[in-house]
UniProtKB/Swiss-Prot annotation:
Positions bound to ATP: 201, 323, 349-352
Catalytic reaction equation(s): (2R)-3-phosphoglycerate + ATP = (2R)-3-phospho-glyceroyl phosphate + ADP
Coarse class of the protein's main subcellular location: cytoplasm
Enzyme superclass (EC): transferase
Name of the protein described by the UniProt record: Phosphoglycerate kinase
Protein residues bound to substrate: 19-21, 35, 58-61, 117, 150
Enzyme Commission number, as recorded: 2.7.2.3
Classification lineage: Bacteria, Pseudomonadati, Thermodesulfobacteriota, Desulfobulbia, Desulfobulbales
Family: Belongs to the phosphoglycerate kinase family.
Subunit and partners: Monomer.
Organism: Desulfotalea psychrophila (strain LSv54 / DSM 12343)
Matching PROSITE patterns: PGLYCERATE_KINASE
InterPro entries in UniProt: Phosphoglycerate_kinase (IPR001576), Phosphoglycerate_kinase_CS (IPR015911), Phosphoglycerate_kinase_N (IPR015824), Phosphoglycerate_kinase_sf (IPR036043)
Length: 392
């Protein structure tokens, strides 16, 4: 996979795929622009090298129709402020009018194409649509790690049709950090896995067998593992169809010498609500009709001890329903412990990153990945279609 610095960009039409799928309020104001800021080094480099910059992205799920609330016009205005230069907004992402705008684009000028997902052909990796996008570019740059696990037209189809192609700085950084953490880690390597469902993480868990030295499992998915060991977790969320899978995983981990840490206590509630009655109980003493919504203080101490001396920490998924303050304690404690560690620490996934931001520890994490699904796919030991297309 070539890097951006290897290509000649002067005077070239440089099409950069980014992920500008940022949150907005009801007045079309951006509430968090981190995804835009993360690709600024790539965009600035293209401009510094005399490229003619064309940017493409999706936003939301307009399902192949033009939906004004998903227009990228507010992004163009915001980006102009960050770059300190005008950013044109195209009326569309393909077509004669767009082709004319690209042809007229001067060196150092910027054009943002309209939302790619206004066309259903984008998510279908349609050959004709990909060909029209590719026709706008002399050079293609993928700097959208967060969508590189999707075989979409702007991610795979365009890369297959443009001879000069490379990874942007953000995509390269993401791949490098993942390689450092999982393929060539400073040991011991500790994996923290949380979130709601075992079903969405089992591929990653099984791939990490034999690769990580310790694993901490929290969040609602821990209930299924505890239940597989005969622990009654009351009305807590359990995936009954995965009890055997969970039991087999724990057995395999033991056989390979990988220590797995499960919660030993919970903060339980009588219902899933911020104002629910709640209390702390041992993991095997969840009252009938109550549900576990966070790991308890004894679990936090256990997990802190498990992290001591770690060389590398990889974290995907929260320990509880941290969006409600009553059930945020376990996740916030873990954020502080990971931040205090001397280990190389990497978080992946929207919930994990949101938790770190809530804790105020973002500056003390080595790297916060921009990709949830892409990060998880790498954790599963799979390649990313977007990266494969750059290497073809």
């Amino acid at each position: 996979m070539k890097s951006l610095r290897e290509l000649e960009l002067a005077g070239k039409r440089v099409l950069v795929r980014v992920d500008f799928n940022v949150p907005m309020d009801d007045k079309q104001r951006i509430t968090d622009d981190i995804r835009i800021r993360m690709v600024l080094p790539t965009l600035r480099y293209v401009l510094e090298q005399g490229g003619r910059l064309i940017i493409c992205s999706h936003m939301g799920r307009p399902k192949g129709k033009r939906v004004e609330e998903y227009s990228l016009a507010p992004i163009a205005r915001h980006l102009a402020g960050l770059l300190g230069r005008d950013v044109g907004i195209a009326p569309d992402c393909i077509g004669a009018e767009v082709e004319a705008q690209v042809a007229a684009l001067g060196v150092g000028e910027v054009l943002l194409l309209q939302n790619l997902r206004f066309y259903g052909e984008e998510t279908e990796n349609d050959a004709v649509f990909a060909g029209k996008l590719a026709g706008l570019a002399d050079v293609y740059v993928n700097d959208a790690f967060a969508v590189s696990h999707r075989a979409h037209a702007s991610v795979v189809g365009v890369a297959e049709r443009v001879a000069e192609k490379c990874a942007g700085f953000l995509l390269q950084t993401e791949i490098d950090y993942f390689h450092k953490s999982m393929n060539d880690p400073i040991r011991p390597l500790v994996a923290l896995v949380g979130g709601a469902k075992v079903s969405s993480k089992i591929g990653a868990l099984e791939n990490m067998l034999g690769k990580v030295d310790k694993m901490i499992i929290g969040g609602a998915m821990a209930n299924t593992f505890l239940m597989s060991q005969g622990v009654d977790v009351g009305a807590s969320k359990v995936e009954d169809d995965l009890l055997v899978t969970a039991r087999n995983f724990l057995q395999a981990a033991g056989e390979r010498g990988m220590k797995v840490y499960l919660p030993v206590d919970f903060v339980v509630a009588d219902r899933f609500a911020a104002d629910a009655v709640h209390k702390t109980v041992p993991a095997d003493s969840v009252p009938e009709g109550w549900m576990a919504l966070d790991v308890g203080p004894a679990s936090s101490i256990l997990f802190r001890e498990a992290l001591q001396g770690a060389g590398t920490i990889v974290w995907n998924g929260p320990m509880g329903a941290f969006e409600m303050d009553a059930f945020a304690g376990g996740t916030m404690s873990l954020c502080r412990d990971v931040a205090a560690s001397q280990a190389l620490s990497i978080t992946g996934g929207g919930d994990s990153n949101a938790a770190v931001k809530k804790s105020g520890e973002a500056d003390n994490i080595s790297y916060m990945s921009t990709g949830g699904g892409a990060f998880l796919q790498l954790m599963e030991g799979k390649t990313l279609p977007g990266v494969d297309a750059l290497e073809a």
